[in-house]
């Protein structure tokens, strides 16, 4: 769609994403994303030491914005085919969700395609395996560091119709909400952080909610 200087801009696609973002923000990530659910289930697998955060975590979270800019916007605009169309480079080169939900089933169910497996398929499956392993240790690594759609929706978190509000008159500053947040957000300090996926764990943990 955005891969040609002569394209007819798909206003309906961008308009729909903006519409959803303006209403829900990253609630989409918390409740509507199937790969988010898969990561949630993987994170429930017991592991000796789960990693909540680490040095460089905040900086690494900026990566999803870089991925959005480079692989969703710039590469499709500047790397085009003879027809002037750009490929969906994020889906083609990175997306582990597409590999798990589309690529793997397609190859497993279609014998004719197995002979066409090349370096790109191996590369994407490597990314998928790394993401799966990290999901057991770290809560939602794909959502935190990679997902360009999460980066897009995060822009709307502070202005979306559905957003969180902390009643400071009732708040007892116990810190339970911050401890409950697996995305490592402190709702008292930033109730509508771009990293908040609206999972509601902070509300469940709040003693005065």
What are these regions (language model features)?
Residues 189:
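Donor-sugar nucleotide-binding helix/loop cap in glycosyltransferases
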Residues 1-184, 194-209:
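Non-ligating segments of multi-cofactor redox enzymes
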